Amino acid sequence: MAITKKMLVVFLLAFLFVTSSVHCSDSTLGIGINQDWKKCFSPDPCKKAGTQGCMEFCRTISFLLFGECTSKPDQCCCVTK
């Protein structure tokens, strides 16, 4: 079975379409498009071990998050940076 030019073009276009739609990120380097994420939880991690406890709590949710303790109201907030 011979591969025709038409089949080759169809395969190439399908390959380009699939590869362009696979990698979608909320952050594009160099352009400055960024969607920050912040979610606050109970103050328990902050009460147990301070900022380090909050940091460890957020890292269990996702390795990309950082934790910070807030005082008004008392909460452990996980944010992206």
Swiss-Prot record:
State the name under which the record lists this protein.
Defensin-like protein 115
Q: Any keyword Signal?
A: yes
Give UniProt keywords alphabetically.
Answer: Antimicrobial, Disulfide bond, Fungicide, Plant defense, Secreted, Signal
Q: Which lineage?
A: Eukaryota, Viridiplantae, Streptophyta, Embryophyta, Tracheophyta
Report the sequence similarity comment from the record: Belongs to the DEFL family.
Organism the protein comes from: Arabidopsis thaliana
Signal peptide feature range: 1-24
The listed locations are: Secreted
What GO biological process terms does the UniProt entry carry, in alphabetical order? Answer: defense response to fungus; killing of cells of another organism
Q: Which cysteines are joined by disulfide bonds?
A: 40-78, 46-69, 54-76, 58-77
What GO terms fall under cellular component here? extracellular region
